[in-house]
Amino acid sequence: MENVEAIVARLEKLEFHVKLLAESLNHTENPIASLVVDFNWSSQDLDCAHDIFEMFDNKIREKSEINWHDLEREFSRKLNISYQGLKSVVLSFNRNGQWTEVCHAYAASFGDSVSLELKSIAQGKVR
């Protein structure tokens, strides 16, 4: 059995390699992989994000009234994602062609005060 120092050294080397690989990810071509690495998400965290988007997608399909602050609260509560971080999440999922109706509706909910990052989604120009 390897000693603890050797195991720690191997883990540190693997962490370094993963960081280098993460830096090589193109957020436009691989938006979800880049997001997962940037936010240090597990597969369960990614599933949770999908669950949140699905909940709001269902509200849109049911034509329910939506308070978009609830989306922000869900991401904050379940994944510790700030408003700034949520913009990255929305951009990534939209670029990946996932939950695009939710992404568009969320971005459009800001009206004329939509952030620069989300403006193209609100206008329906980005995917």
Where are these regions (language model features)?
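Long, leucine- and charge-enriched amphipathic alpha-helices
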Residues: 1-35
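Short, charge-rich amphipathic segments
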Residues: 3-8, 37-44, 117-126
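Short, well-structured alpha-helical interface segments that form or flank functional binding sites
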Residues: 6-9, 13-16, 44, 48-51, ...
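Intrinsic-disorder-associated interaction segments
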Residues: 7-10, 14, 42, 64, ...
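Amphipathic alpha-helical interaction modules
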Residues: 25-80
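Amphipathic alpha-helical binding modules
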Residues: 76-127
